[in-house]
């Protein structure tokens, strides 16, 4: 039998400045994986994390 889906989801967050900023230290897009609680956080997640391509802390938004 298949098990029931849990409440926690594994999601990917991506740097918002890497896509639009050509003045980066290195080419590429910063992505992190994290988990979120489906019941408590129903909307898209936004966190400030370090981006090695921009060389600073930036807002990372959830992508599908």
From Swiss-Prot:
SUPFAM superfamilies: Zn-binding ribosomal proteins
Gene Ontology CC annotations of this record: cytoplasm; ribonucleoprotein complex; ribosome
Signal peptide: none
InterPro entries: Ribosomal_bL33, Ribosomal_bL33_CS, Ribosomal_bL33_sf, Ribosomal_zn-bd
HAMAP family in alphabetical order: Ribosomal_bL33
Superkingdom field: Bacteria
Ribosomal protein keyword on record: yes
Species assigned in the record: Microcystis aeruginosa (strain NIES-843 / IAM M-2473)
Residues forming coiled coils: none
GO BP, one annotated term: translation
Name of protein: Large ribosomal subunit protein bL33
Entry keyword set: Ribonucleoprotein, Ribosomal protein
Disulfide bonds: none
Protein family membership: Belongs to the bacterial ribosomal protein bL33 family.
Family matches, as Pfam families: Ribosomal_L33 (PF00471)
Gene3D superfamilies: Ribosomal protein L33 (2.20.28.120)
One function term, GO molecular function aspect: structural constituent of ribosome
């Amino acid at each position: 039998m298949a098990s029931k889906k849990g409440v926690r989801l594994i999601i990917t967050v991506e740097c918002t400045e890497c896509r639009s900023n050509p003045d980066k230290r290195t080419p590429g897009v910063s992505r992190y994986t994290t988990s979120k609680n489906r019941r408590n956080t129903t909307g898209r997640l936004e966190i400030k994390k370090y981006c090695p391509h921009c060389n600073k802390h930036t807002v990372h938004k959830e992508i599908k």
